[in-house]
C-alpha cells in the first residue's frame, strides 16, 4: 500500500476525510502511514512537515481562502517539486485554482469528482483511488453524484451534476 497524505484548511472536509482515513486503516484497506492533517493560514513549515512528506507517495490538498502565497506554501511547493511527489492541490478561489503533477488527466477527473460529490462514501473512495493510482488498482467504485451535489427538477429523468447538461436537457 502507498502513503497517501491529505491536507486541508477546510474544517468539515478535514473532519470527514479524517474519519474516512481511520475507517480504511482499521479495515486494512489503506496504509497506516497515510495521514490526514489540518492546515491554517498560520501553519509553519518545519522538519515535521518534511518528514511527513518526504516518503509520501501522493499528496492531496484542499485549500480555500487565502492564496498559495503563505510562508507554508512558499516552502511546501519547492519541496514537493524537488522530491517529485505526485500531487493535486485544489485551491479553488485562489489565483492558482489548482496545481497538479504526476497525475494523469483521467485519474485527476475522478479525484475531482470524488471530492466534489462529497459524502463519506466518496471520501473513502477518494483515498482508495489515490492509493490505486500508485498500485495500479483503480477499479474503485465510480464517484457517486449525491443528490445534494446536483440540480433538481421534478420532471427530470435523471440527476444533473452540471449546468450545461441540465440546460440542454428536456425536462418536460
Protein language model features and the residues they cover:
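An N-terminal assembly and electron-transfer interface module characteristic of large anaerobic redox
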Residues: 1-172
Amino acid at each position: 500500500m502507498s502513503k497517501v497524505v491529505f491536507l486541508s484548511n477546510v474544517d468539515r472536509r478535514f473532519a470527514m476525510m479524517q474519519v474516512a482515513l481511520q475507517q480504511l486503516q482499521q479495515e486494512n484497506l489503506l496504509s497506516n502511514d497515510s495521514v490526514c492533517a489540518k492546515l491554517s493560514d498560520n501553519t509553519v513549515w518545519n522538519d515535521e512537515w518534511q518528514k511527513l512528506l518526504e516518503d509520501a507517495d501522493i499528496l492531496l490538498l484542499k485549500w480555500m481562502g487565502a492564496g498559495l502565497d503563505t510562508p507554508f506554501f512558499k516552502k511546501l511547493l519547492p519541496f514537493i517539486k524537488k522530491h517529485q511527489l505526485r500531487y493535486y492541490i485544489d485551491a479553488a478561489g485562489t489565483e492558482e485554482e489548482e496545481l497538479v503533477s504526476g497525475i494523469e488527466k483521467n485519474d485527476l477527473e475522478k479525484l475531482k469528482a470524488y471530492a466534489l460529490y462529497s459524502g463519506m462514501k466518496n471520501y473513502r473512495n477518494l483515498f482508495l483511488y489515490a492509493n490505486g493510482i500508485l498500485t495500479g488498482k483503480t477499479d474503485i467504485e465510480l464517484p457517486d453524484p449525491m443528490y445534494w451535489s446536483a440540480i433538481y427538477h421534478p420532471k427530470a429523468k435523471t440527476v444533473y451534476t452540471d449546468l450545461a447538461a441540465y440546460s440542454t436537457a428536456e425536462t418536460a
